[in-house]
Amino acid sequence: MAKVVAVTGATGFVGSHLVHRLAREGWSVRILARRMPQAALVPDAIIDVVIGGLGDARALRRLVRGADAVIHVAGIVKARHRADFQVANVEGTRLVLAAVSEAAPMARFIHISSLAAREPHLSPYA
């Protein structure tokens, strides 16, 4: 039986490439998406699409429950207000970690950041 990996940010540039790679390597993939992605973007290995966002604790628990690994790719590097970075990147990550702690405490957790985190001229995200 294939191991299950839960992925946030799966419909973005990095996340979509990651999901396809995981599928090629034999993982069963469960993704979080704000809305149902186009069928062409979804590899056959996706076993479930959990509709919700980083602020939806219930959806995050559904996403990670029973996962062997959780890869958190979701985040923002552009926002209208500085506080939006805090909500999406800090609070969203905190909620993902809380869901893992509650619903998949043995899962490996990988957090993928952005080049913008170390290049202040690219984004206020840094």
Segments and roles (model prediction):
Residues W27-R35:
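Conserved glycine-rich Rossmann-like NAD(P)H-binding loop of the short-chain dehydrogenase/reductase
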Residues S28, A69, M106:
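Residue-level detector of anion-binding/catalytic polar loops
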Residues P37-L41, I47-R94, S101, L115-S123:
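NAD(P)H-binding glycine-rich loop region in Rossmannoid oxidoreductase-like domains
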Residues A2-K3, A107:
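Nucleotide donor/acceptor-binding cores
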Residues T8, L32, V70-A74, F109-L115:
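SDR active-site strand-loop-helix element
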